[in-house]
Amino acid sequence: MRVLVTGAGGFIGHHLTNFLVGRGCWVRGVDLHQPEYAASAAHEFLQLDLRHWENTLIATRDVDQVYHLAANMGGIGFISSHKAEIVRDSGLINLHTLEAARVNGVQRFLFSSSACVYPSYRQDSPDVTPLKEEDALPADPED
């Protein structure tokens, strides 16, 4: 099985890459940056900006599955002061990667989202119950 992990330089992507390699998958890791704390276990690691269509075509070429974790993100200070930039960049990354996967005949595509899609009233309760996908609706944007 040939697998692409986008966001492979990040915390979750790094651990997912290790897991998939341990399961016998050939893994291509892609990230805007090299992993900061430890070398990637990916068989191939490409440093690509997935906001650009051509790079997503390169990233998704010759793989069977995509685990899509890449996004423009940062700490709360960055997020709070760069909202439009984050929406634009993450939108481009998501749309380009999904379409490139389709064009390149990828069989499976896993999209990883964020707990931030859930309304804050579902996150603030001390009564912690597992959230379901449909709990994100109706949408309740903060700003």
Indicate residue ranges for each PLM-predicted region.
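N-terminal Rossmann-like NAD(P)+-binding domain of SDR-like oxidoreductases, especially those catalyzing
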Residues: 1-143
